[in-house]
């Protein structure tokens, strides 16, 4: 009986020491540490001010399409007046609402680069219809908005947009791109041919419950804004 008690005591001490040792192990010291660069991951940058074409190119290259920003089909319910302070009559203009319209911030930023376009979007005496491409439509272009395949063919890929003359070509191309999406009238009736600020002739037609810009048959996702000097139509494509 005494021998059994001694054996039990020895076993108890053995297990007690084993458990105590296990609890004292520096377990957390052996876990893999997260690399410092991941711990201090930089935050994404917000929209920056664009002062020249090089800055604009860099900014455009870093833009990503908005995810999940699905627009409703065009209808009377989609037309709305935005209550923001605007021009001389204290009514909002296209220039006021364009930067606030969801999913088109790339095109909205481009309009502010050209005084003639921006002035027209502020003008309360001349209505316009802005065909604003979605961010994803601009991102999906096979080339940048300031690029023209004819320039590459004529001047070569290395020289097309280099130097002062190249920069001037890029600016002209970009202004042409922006102007091609501003129709110089509103209201704009179905089947009525209208001219853009870039000189293009466009019409629109309804097919079922959808609106298409002709002749390129670009779908209108929504009539997003209706203000004192016109409307903003969000389109799923670009005017070439």
Curated annotation (Swiss-Prot):
InterPro entries: FAS1_dom_sf (IPR036378), FAS1_domain (IPR000782), Mug57-like (IPR040200)
Location of the protein in the cell: Vacuole
GO cellular component term, pick one: vacuole
Residues of the FAS1 domain: 91-239
Keyword annotations of the record: Signal, Vacuole
Signal peptide: 1-24
Protein name (database record): FAS1 domain-containing protein AN1527
Source organism per UniProt: Emericella nidulans (strain FGSC A4 / ATCC 38163 / CBS 112.46 / NRRL 194 / M139)
Lineage, highest ranks first: Eukaryota, Fungi, Dikarya, Ascomycota, Pezizomycotina
């Amino acid at each position: 009986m005494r021998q059994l008690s001694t054996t039990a005591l020895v076993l108890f001490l053995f297990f007690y020491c084993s458990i105590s040792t296990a609890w004292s192990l520096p377990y957390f010291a052996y876990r893999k540490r997260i690399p410092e660069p991941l711990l201090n991951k930089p935050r994404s940058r917000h929209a920056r001010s664009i002062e020249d074409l090089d800055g604009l190119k860099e900014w455009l290259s870093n833009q990503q399409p908005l995810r999940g920003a699905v627009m409703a089909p065009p209808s009377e319910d989609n037309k709305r007046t935005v209550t923001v302070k605007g021009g001389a009559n204290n009514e909002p203009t296209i220039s006021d609402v364009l930067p606030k319209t969801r999913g088109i911030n790339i095109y909205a930023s481009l309009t502010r680069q050209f005084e003639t376009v921006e002035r027209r979007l502020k003008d309360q005496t001349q209505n316009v219809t802005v065909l604003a491409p979605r961010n994803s439509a601009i991102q999906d272009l096979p080339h940048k908005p300031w690029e023209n395949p004819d320039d590459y063919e004529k001047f070569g890929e290395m020289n097309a947009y280099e130097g002062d003359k190249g920069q001037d070509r890029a600016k002209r191309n970009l202004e042409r791109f922006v102007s091609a999406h501003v129709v110089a009238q509103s209201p704009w009736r179905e089947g009525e041919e209208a001219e853009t600020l870039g000189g293009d002739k466009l019409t629109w037609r309804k097919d079922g419950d959808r609106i298409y810009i002709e002749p390129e048959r670009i779908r209108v996702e929504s009539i997003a804004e209706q203000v004192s000097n016109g409307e903003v139509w969000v389109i799923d494509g670009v005017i070439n």
